[in-house]
Amino acid sequence: MARIAGINIPDHKHAVIALTAIYGIGKTRSQAICAAAGIAEDVKIRELSEEQIDKLRDEVGKFTVEGDLRREVTLNIKRLLDLGCYRGLRHRRSLPVRGQRTKTNARTRKGPRKPIKK
């Protein structure tokens, strides 16, 4: 297994799909990384030489991924909470942040229903 950005990349998958195992890299970004590294998208990871894997590592290293990205997202949410702005309040109350309706939906964000005690 190739190790890129601290993650073991699956050998049996195509390069584009295998790179999406890294947090912060989706299909579009993985296609751009493969193109920049000069690697065909349909080549499997186990078929790549060590030089090609090093090129992939260099290209992935140009982006914020994995732990750094998770930390950045967490700090962004913490900043909103500290500011006390509307979005921060919505995060604090575990409600949808981006203007979705909450009268009927938003069960995922609000959690299971709480029965009303009489």
From Swiss-Prot:
It comes from the Bacteria. Keywords: Ribonucleoprotein, Ribosomal protein, RNA-binding, rRNA-binding, tRNA-binding. Pfam families: Ribosomal_S13. GO terms for cellular component: cytosol; small ribosomal subunit. InterPro entries: Rbsml_uS13_C, Ribosomal_uS13, Ribosomal_uS13-like_H2TH, Ribosomal_uS13_bac-type, Ribosomal_uS13_CS. Residues 94-118 are annotated as: Disordered. One of its GO terms (molecular function) is tRNA binding. GO terms for biological process: translation. Located at the top of the head of the 30S subunit, it contacts several helices of the 16S rRNA. In the 70S ribosome it contacts the 23S rRNA (bridge B1a) and protein L5 of the 50S subunit (bridge B1b), connecting the 2 subunits; these bridges are implicated in subunit movement. Contacts the tRNAs in the A and P-sites. Belongs to the universal ribosomal protein uS13 family. PANTHER family: 30S RIBOSOMAL PROTEIN S13/40S RIBOSOMAL PROTEIN S18, SMALL RIBOSOMAL SUBUNIT PROTEIN US13M. Part of the 30S ribosomal subunit. Forms a loose heterodimer with protein S19. Forms two bridges to the 50S subunit in the 70S ribosome. This is Small ribosomal subunit protein uS13. It comes from Haemophilus influenzae (strain PittEE).
